[in-house]
Amino acid sequence: MQRYDPCPIVQQKITGAGAGVSLLLGRESKLLGALCHRRVREYPITGGPSTCCESFYDEKMIDEAYELLKSFHFTGLAMVEFKGDCILEVNPRVWGSFPMTEAAQSPIVAHYAQAAQGGQVTYTAKDYRTGVKMRFFLNDTVAALSYLKAGRVKEGLRGLGDFFTAKEALSAKGDGKVMRAYLKKSLFER
């Protein structure tokens, strides 16, 4: 390594299921909202962004993520990413799987708007639907096909099955512009 970089950064490879804890923290880092999701598929399949995820509830993960953000007096929206029992990163912003907040009927967005206007917001545990799958149509189709090509038939077929049951991440009620823009960019501008 010395030949390529005199001071390489060496990191441990972490295995296990990927999951995220989305949090909204108000003034004085008060917890105002939380939502957990697990990665179902990703692309590239060797490690990349979620193409399909599912909502679930894990109080321990929420507590760990909250204590971390609270320790540096964070305020706002953030997603803490876990792999197995390890925290990988913190995204202190709106993140890629943010549409899960709508798909799982989480009040995080409403709480954000209320808090921004100075309103009182109280956190309630498990205030969203669990077991809700959400996907990014094109990316998830490519992921499912990649699993099949790699010989991971069960995962690939499950992905094709989710085509009919998972909620579309970029489908907004009454507004097809978002989905049309996504399809146009994905199909013609890459």
Give residue ranges: language-model regions.
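Secondary-structure boundary/capping residues
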Residues: 77, 99, 121-122
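Short N-terminal signal/transit or membrane-insertion segments
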Residues: 17-23, 78, 146-154
